[in-house]
């Protein structure tokens, strides 16, 4: 009866433990929520320790990674490798960088390109003539002299005009440019070293016209008053008349007389006939009533 009157200590312990279990199960979601909040609010690595992305040459916008611990290393390596390869080259040097002079023997450096350009002018001064030195013109029959090379070049344009030419000293041929003259000199020198080719054969001269024998001269045999002219054997008519009997040697008969004066004359018989006919025609008139009058004449 005493055992039933009051619960034992063991039963009380079991009841308390069973009553506390729902409380623990109810409180477990709260603990999980606080754990997730703490994990989200847990700060990552110090942002000041990692330089911003634009300093490493990447884009200006930065996207937060959902898992900062896992993608921290990948973002740094990715920004250094690919972004630097794809970006445009920088025209302006970063602040604090000095640009060295590229002239040999000069170790100066400048913060900007403008300062470097002004410094380079000291290494490349404009061309100036020496004091007291005169530049003379090299053209023939020209005695002009100038204090600077620029004036001499401007003066040289007066001698060498666009229609200038270059002459070969061997064959006296003229060329427009030096290159064409040099090409010709190779050919001209080769021809000068080789023996000259034989001259081309002269044109065949026209065979001399054979002289007619004296016996075949019809004028001498007929006793014509003009032995130098060829008589026409017939009287041809038509448009071919001037082509049938052309003058010998292509000259008119009056112009042939000095050339044919040295030719042998006709035989003695024809000469006698010529003199006889000439004497008969050119005999002087006899006076009328003279002693030489014919016997049958009227007195």
Curated annotation (Swiss-Prot):
It is found in: Nucleus. It comes from the Eukaryota. One of its GO terms (molecular function) is DNA binding. A zinc finger (C2H2-type) spans 99-123, 135-159, 166-190. Residues 203-215 have a biased composition (Basic and acidic residues). Residues 1-20, 70-80, 268-285 have a biased composition (Polar residues). The keyword Plastid does not apply. Residues 1-102, 193-228, 254-299 are annotated as: Disordered. Keywords: DNA-binding, Metal-binding, Nucleus, Repeat, Transcription, Transcription regulation, Zinc, Zinc-finger. Residues 217-228 have a biased composition (Low complexity). InterPro entries: ZN414, Znf-C2H2_ribbon, Znf_C2H2_type. GO terms for cellular component: nucleus. May be involved in transcriptional regulation. Belongs to the krueppel C2H2-type zinc-finger protein family. This is Zinc finger protein 414. The lineage of its organism: Eukaryota, Metazoa, Chordata, Craniata, Vertebrata. The gene is Znf414.
């Amino acid at each position: 009866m005493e055992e039933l009157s009051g619960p034992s200590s063991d039963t009380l312990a079991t009841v308390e433990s069973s009553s506390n279990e729902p409380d623990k199960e109810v409180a477990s979601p709260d603990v999980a929520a606080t754990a997730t909040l703490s994990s989200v609010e847990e700060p990552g690595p110090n942002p000041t320790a990692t330089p911003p992305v634009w300093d490493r040459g990447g884009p200006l916008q930065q996207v937060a990674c959902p898992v900062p611990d896992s993608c921290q290393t990948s973002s740094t390596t990715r920004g250094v490798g690919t972004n630097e390869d794809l970006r445009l080259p920088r025209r302006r040097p970063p602040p604090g960088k000095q640009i060295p002079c590229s002239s040999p023997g000069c170790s100066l450096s400048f913060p900007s390109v403008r300062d470097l350009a002004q410094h380079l002018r000291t290494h490349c001064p404009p061309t100036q003539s020496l004091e007291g030195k005169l530049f003379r013109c090299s053209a023939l029959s020209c005695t002009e002299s100038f204090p600077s090379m620029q004036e001499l070049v401007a003066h040289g344009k007066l001698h060498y005009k666009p229609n200038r030419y270059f002459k070969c000293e061997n064959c006296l041929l003229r060329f427009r440019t030096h290159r064409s003259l040099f090409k010709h000199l190779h050919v001209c020198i080769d021809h000068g070293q080789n023996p000259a080719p034989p001259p081309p054969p002269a044109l065949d001269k026209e065979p001399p016209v054979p002289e007619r024998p004296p016996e075949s001269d019809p004028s001498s045999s007929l006793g014509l008053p003009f032995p130098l002219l060829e008589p026409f054997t017939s009287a041809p008519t038509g448009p071919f008349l001037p082509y049938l009997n052309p003058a010998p040697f292509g000259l008119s008969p009056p112009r042939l007389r000095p050339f044919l004066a040295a030719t042998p004359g006709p035989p003695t018989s024809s000469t006698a006939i010529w003199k006889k006919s000439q004497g008969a025609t050119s005999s002087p008139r006899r006076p009328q009533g003279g002693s030489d009058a014919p016997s049958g004449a009227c007195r």
